[in-house]
């Protein structure tokens, strides 16, 4: 999945070894909570840049992946920042850049209500570098939702 702006991750594969749920819209990327309870949500997102960085990131640029409840009220449930190399060699070099390839892992437990809708999002937060989500070597993206109670 090639992206360069903030977006919801869509177009999921649910064939073996992955699995589907009647609550998951793999095309739109939305999971609708079937029953009120406690849920474990996990995601592993591999990525790679599609071009070399030519400038340093600004201090406020912190791209991330977020599992967000989009309905009934938009709420970030868990987020993970991209790994950033932050180098400052006095009077010579000040560099801040995302790694060319990396992995962001998200995990948490949440009290959710039947009918809540959640999705996995890329939040660019000022990053304009094109990304290949899933990584250059097809390591992929996996996210799962499990009811605990």
Specify the residue positions occupied by each region the protein language model found:
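Extracellular jelly-roll beta-sandwich "head" domains, especially the C-terminal globular C1q domain
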Residues: 1-149
């Amino acid at each position: 999945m090639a992206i360069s702006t903030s977006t919801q991750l869509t177009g999921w594969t649910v064939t073996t070894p992955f699995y589907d749920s009647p609550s998951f819209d793999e095309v739109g990327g939305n999971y609708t909570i079937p029953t009120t309870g406690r849920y474990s949500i996990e995601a592993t997102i591999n990525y790679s840049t599609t071009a070399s960085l030519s400038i340093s990131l600004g201090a406020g640029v912190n791209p991330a992946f977020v599992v967000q409840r989009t309905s009934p009220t938009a709420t970030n449930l868990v987020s993970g920042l991209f790994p950033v190399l932050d180098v400052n060699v006095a009077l010579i070099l000040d560099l801040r850049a995302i790694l060319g390839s990396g992995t962001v892992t998200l995990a948490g437990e949440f009290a959710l209500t039947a009918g809540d809708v959640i999705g996995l999002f890329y939040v660019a937060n000022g990053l304009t570098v094109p990304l290949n989500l899933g990584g250059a070597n097809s390591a992929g993206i996996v996210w799962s939702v499990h009811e605990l109670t």
